[in-house]
Amino acid sequence: MTPGPTVTVNGRTYRCPRDPVVIVCIDGSEPAYFDAAIAAGRSPAIARFRRSGFATLARSVVPSFTNPNNLSIVTGVSPAVHGIAGNYFYDAAGAREVMMNDPQFLRCETLLAVLAREGAGVVVITAKDKLRRLLGHGLRGVCFSSEKAAEATKEEHGIDRVTDLVAMPVPDVYSAELSEYVLAAGLALFERERPDVMYLSLTDYIQHKHPPGDPVANEFYAMLDHYFDAFDRGGAILGITADHGMNAKSRADGTPNVVYLTPLVESMVGSGQARVILPITDPYVVHHGALGSFATIHLSRADDASRVIARLAATPGVAEVYDGPTGCARFELPADRLGDVIVVSERDVVLGKAPEAHDLSLLREPLRSHGGVSEQTVPFVLNRALVSGTRAGTDLRNFDIFDYALNRVA
């Protein structure tokens, strides 16, 4: 792409890339994972970027889930603008609960689509296919998932024969290799085609199972570091962030530490008079059992909200509770896609519907999950230093990463 021009997307202006830009979103990467891997000598590239590049912490979007944060990263704005408020929501107009994976729910363009329209070569690779259609909306470029790499076609994905790129089989969706496949395919395309912009989004399989410092987690971060080093040495401007963090959410006996909202609320408003929505819900329940730290409640009678809020505010394990408009203003969310009440749990607690609504038999380890303010802090790393005289923002968001990679690095 010819250096020099700029594009303006969703009110933000970006320089078109002069060097290849690679942005990696490490799903579920609590900052302590990098700290532990560096301390164990497993992440020398990240240690190098901390010394000679730029490294700090940033806030992700709350609810701290995959879809809202990935879409914020590629649009540069909050869910109040782009409209993707969770992985799952209640469509009041259609009176149905739906996955928020369809591009019809996206309310603005992505930076990736605009750059491609202006002539940039753009590559998007996701681990899970659930994100692919959202991230690739309006994109003239390459966009595929490692989950369904064998099914990629030029017509739909901008590329075929993806499996020829990587000397490993297409991984199981519940595996660390699903993320490695993203990076391996990304590096192969980077070396072969040197696209102007790449967005590589991983999966949090490891983070749901292994805490920071665990040998398995350190091994995973060593693998990531290998690819970060390769992109850096290949001349890329590399930006690394996460969609959310991750915390332990279990009791001492290993069982999930859950506040079940449906029986609690229905004891006040009556059976069938409240609909609890858990925006963490997605097809990958082995990770979390659809238990996260953010919930929204639709009430048959909106004037019940004040007493429901008062009751929940006094409930152990609940950190914050708001009426819908107040919660949406607090977290920059689209008010028409949240309920009458918004609930956020404490760091070590998750929110559920009712016990019978969650099949926890698939959880093989003590629950680690996300969704709340306690999982909002994420890494924000660039392999290059900021331009001399550039001051870092005092309240960085993970969705500032493209701004920094395109506009602010030396």
Regions found by a protein language model. Give the residues of each.
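Short, structured active-site-proximal loop/turn typified by the sulfatase FGly-forming signature C/S-X-P-X-R
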Residues: D35-G76, V123
